[in-house]
Structure formats: structure tokens, C-alpha cells
A protein has these predicted regions:
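Intrinsic-disorder-associated interaction segments
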Residues: 15, 32-39, 43, 154, ...
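Residues in flexible loops and secondary-structure boundaries
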Residues: 9, 72-74, 193-195
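N-terminal Sec-pathway targeting helices
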Residues: 1-15, 23-24
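Beta-strand acidic-aromatic groove motif in beta-rich domains, primarily in extracellular
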Residues: 96
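N-terminal export/targeting and maturation segments
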Residues: 20-91, 100-101
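Extracytoplasmic electrostatic interaction patches
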Residues: 100-198
Length: 198
């Protein structure tokens, strides 16, 4: 009787471990530990840059919450990746920047358009964010967003938020330098495989 239970438990453990392996293979990007660390560090700084801009330049915001980092094109040294910030207004509505609005598809926030991630010849991280003028700012050695990388203008973000307000997805969110000082920013550096928009 006890041998039967041992076999059943062994089979269950085998099935569970196999399921865990398959789940990770399907949902987690296949990046090495050094590249994973670079993506997490770089995207945290990008999220701080985007979140700070929205919080400091818009009133009526309760919370800004970031999606996981979606890695969409694997197979080369560096994959395409992006994040999507979701804005919560004071009326309980929420809308995600980068999602399609009627027939308009706004830009996403990620590699190529907002951040450069690489390694230098010595294997050190290279992280560059774009400033308000589109010029790269080296933030490789920064743990938090430095003042020189804080955005004063972000036209694509402004257009996206304006469209979300016009579409009725957000209420009472207005561009104003008073900002929303009490707004909470929730960062997310978890890596996910695939595209959230599909």
C-alpha cells in the first residue's frame, strides 16, 4: 500500500516540475543573468523618468502603475522590450498609455524609442535615457533617476494622455505644472515574454 502512494507522489512531483518548466519556457524571456540585470536596471530608470514626468505635469492622478517589461523579439543578443504605464484618475477610471485609442496606436515606451541598453568593451552596463530634446543622457551608474534625466517635455506622452481624456477613459486629468504630488507610482521590473497588446 505504501509503495503505491510513493509512486503516486513521485508522479505528481514529476508532473508539477514539468509544468513549472513549461510555464517558465512559455512566459519568461530567455535572457542571461547579466542581460536580465541590465534590463531590470535600465527599465526601472525609464519607469522613474516616465512616472515622474506624468506625476509632476498632470493634475487629477491618483496612481501610475507600470506593466511588466514585455520582451518581444528574442534570439539576438538584445531583444525588443517595452513597458506600459497605466494611469488611474481620481474618479476610479484607469487607462494604459500605448494602447490603441479608436484608430490611433500611440508609441510604446521601450528600447529604440526611449532607452538604449548595451554593454561596453569591458562588459559594464551602458544605459542611456533620452532627455526632453531627444539627446541621450548616460545613467549607467545611477540607482535612481538623476536630475539631468528628468523630462520637462514629452510630446508623445502628452498626446497620448490628451487622447485618453478626449475618449473619456480618464476624467479630470489636466496638464498642469502643479502636478499630482500625492500620486503613487508603482514600478514593475518583472520580465515577461511576448507582447501584451496581442
Amino acid at each position: 500500500m505504501s509503495r503505491k502512494w510513493v509512486k503516486i507522489i513521485a508522479i505528481l512531483i514529476f508532473i508539477l516540475s514539468g509544468s513549472y518548466f513549461v510555464y517558465n519556457k512559455l512566459t519568461k524571456p530567455n535572457l542571461g543573468p547579466k542581460t536580465t540585470k541590465l534590463y531590470k536596471h535600465g527599465f526601472l530608470l525609464l519607469e522613474e523618468q516616465i512616472g515622474t514626468y506624468i506625476k509632476e505635469h498632470y493634475t487629477g492622478i491618483e496612481k501610475i502603475e507600470f506593466s511588466p517589461i514585455y520582451v518581444t523579439e528574442e534570439g539576438s543578443t538584445f531583444s525588443n522590450a517595452y513597458v506600459s504605464p497605466t494611469i488611474y484618475d481620481k474618479y476610479g477610471n484607469k487607462a494604459t498609455l500605448g494602447d490603441k485609442i479608436k484608430k490611433f496606436i500611440p508609441l510604446s515606451y521601450g528600447l529604440i524609442s526611449d532607452i538604449v541598453l548595451d554593454f561596453d568593451g569591458g562588459g559594464n552596463e551602458v544605459i542611456e535615457l533620452l532627455d526632453s530634446n531627444g539627446k541621450p543622457v548616460d545613467v549607467s551608474n545611477e540607482e535612481h533617476l538623476p536630475k539631468r534625466a528628468i523630462l520637462t517635455e514629452a510630446s508623445s506622452t502628452d498626446e497620448n494622455i490628451e487622447l485618453l481624456v478626449e475618449d473619456g477613459q480618464l476624467i479630470g486629468v489636466v496638464k498642469d505644472d502643479k502636478g499630482s504630488p500625492g500620486a503613487e507610482i508603482v514600478y514593475n521590473t518583472e520580465l515577461h515574454k511576448g507582447d501584451a497588446r496581442e
